[in-house]
């Protein structure tokens, strides 16, 4: 059968906090586990390639597909480039998990990755760099603070680390260390990470880090990030939300232009590719949820007018 994975636009047309309109931006994709929005389209992972889907006529559906780069390893698909995150310069950080060996030919020369780490793609120059090299299982979560410092999740374990030490160009095969910044109240596995940067949320929590957990704890932990030479440490602040629904699987979270927080719930009874048969009928391929978190005692932010 033909690929039919989708990128959907969910729109709240009457500003009541609930989506009431759905548009299929793309409906012919194959496992798009990482994407980042551009002003005229979307950068998305497609098998072993980074692809740009461009909307040329403004109808919220892509018209042109351009393969920007190929050669990313995808033989173990859930480790392939994913969890895209734009840094302050507009470059896209792309995560890659263990067991993969990527060799990407670019106009600036080949870029290689082995056994986990991060690539950085600059859309303006079309330059790809091996951004950081770590042996990490599933880095399903990258967040960038107000100063451009990047933190990332290890996912299979409980750890969260600072990315900068892995940017050192080490000798081939060297296993650079990624010290864990979380001291207490950490649960595995993790998926989805975000810095609090919203005038809708209280002043005292700005700069905190939010971390989703989806098996050992069904919710999100909130930690204060503290500067500590030569990097950072953290201090547990609170559980931001938790669910009694055993199928609640928060996998991503991001702040919206109005200051509210959106949380993606995979909503699945089964999780993991080793524990259950891939064709187990209890795997839910059709349902998911998106929650919107607000802070009632503070007003929402008036979004900036981008177009029109």
Provide a role label for each language-model segment:
Residues 1-308:
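Beta-propeller domains with acidic blade repeats across secreted/periplasmic ectodomains
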């Amino acid at each position: 059968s033909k690929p039919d994975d989708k990128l959907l636009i969910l729109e709240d047309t009457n500003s009541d906090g609930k989506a009431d309109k759905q548009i299929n931006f793309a409906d012919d994709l194959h496992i798009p586990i990482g994407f980042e929005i551009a002003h005229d389209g979307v950068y998305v992972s497609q098998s072993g390639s980074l692809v740009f889907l461009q909307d040329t006529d403004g109808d919220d559906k892509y018209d042109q597909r351009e393969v920007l780069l190929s050669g990313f390893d995808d033989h173990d698909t859930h480790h392939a480039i994913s969890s895209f995150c734009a840094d302050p310069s507009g470059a896209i950080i792309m995560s890659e998990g263990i067991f993969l060996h990527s060799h990407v030919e670019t106009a600036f020369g080949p870029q290689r990755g082995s056994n986990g780490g991060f690539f950085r793609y600059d859309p303006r120059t079309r330059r790809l760099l091996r951004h950081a090299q770590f042996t990490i299982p599933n880095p399903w979560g990258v967040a960038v603070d107000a100063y451009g410092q990047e933190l990332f999740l290890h996912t299979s374990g409980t750890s969260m680390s600072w990315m900068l030490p892995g940017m050192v160009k080490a000798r081939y095969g060297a296993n650079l260390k990624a010290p864990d910044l979380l001291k207490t109240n950490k649960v595995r596995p993790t998926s989805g990470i975000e810095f609090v940067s919203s005038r809708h949320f209280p002043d005292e929590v700005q700069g905190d880090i939010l971390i989703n957990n989806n098996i050992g704890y069904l919710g999100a932990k909130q930690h204060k990030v503290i500067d500590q030479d030569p990097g950072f440490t953290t201090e547990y602040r609170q559980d931001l939300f938790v669910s009694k629904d055993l199928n609640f699987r928060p996998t991503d979270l991001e702040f919206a232009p109005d200051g509210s927080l959106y949380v993606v719930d995979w909503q699945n009874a089964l999780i993991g590719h080793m524990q259950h048969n891939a064709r187990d009928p209890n795997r839910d391929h059709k349902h998911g949820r998106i929650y919107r978190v607000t802070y009632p005692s503070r007003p929402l932010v008036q979004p900036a007018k981008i177009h029109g």
